[in-house]
């Protein structure tokens, strides 16, 4: 009886974890680079910049997954319903590991029960940190 509880707890935990991972096995490849806002495709950023959260500009999608990978490791995924909000600690580790190189972002969008995998785009990471006195703000056009 004492063994049943730990074993059942482990099984329930595994079922819960696998239930939280979206099934992306039915993917439709797309040769287009995804339209995102703000547009971070092919940009160079300082190595100490805050996470570059974004929103896909596609219409009528129900979920989105972004895969971030560096040429020097640190692959991670972020999922969301409408926005991609990157965890700060994973972002910092990825940038520190890939200073002076680039990271690749692959976007998958769930639309009409099909996952559309867009072409990956790079974000280049400068070796230099962000200037201490740099301040910016968003000004409407």
Feature map (PLM): residue ranges:
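Bacterial N-terminal signal peptides that target proteins for export
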Residues: 1-8
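Intrinsic low-complexity, intrinsically disordered segments enriched in polar/basic residues
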Residues: 2, 14, 138-139
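Bacterial N-terminal signal peptides
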Residues: 8-18
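Sequence signature of WD/YWTD-type beta-propeller architectures
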Residues: 20-141
């Amino acid at each position: 009886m004492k063994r049943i509880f730990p074993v059942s707890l482990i099984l329930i935990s595994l079922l819960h974890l696998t239930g939280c991972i979206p099934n992306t096995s039915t993917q439709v490849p797309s040769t287009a680079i995804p339209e995102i806002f703000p547009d971070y495709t092919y940009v160079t950023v300082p190595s100490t910049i805050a996470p570059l959260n974004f929103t896909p500009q596609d219409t009528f999608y129900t979920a989105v997954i972004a895969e971030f990978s560096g040429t020097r490791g640190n692959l991670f995924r972020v999922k969301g319903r409408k926005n991609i909000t990157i965890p700060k600690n994973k972002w910092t580790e990825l940038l520190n590991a890939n200073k002076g190189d680039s990271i690749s972002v692959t976007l998958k969008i769930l639309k009409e029960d099909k996952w559309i995998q867009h072409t990956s785009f790079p974000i280049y990471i400068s070796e230099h940190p962000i200037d201490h006195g740099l301040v910016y703000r968003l000004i409407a056009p």
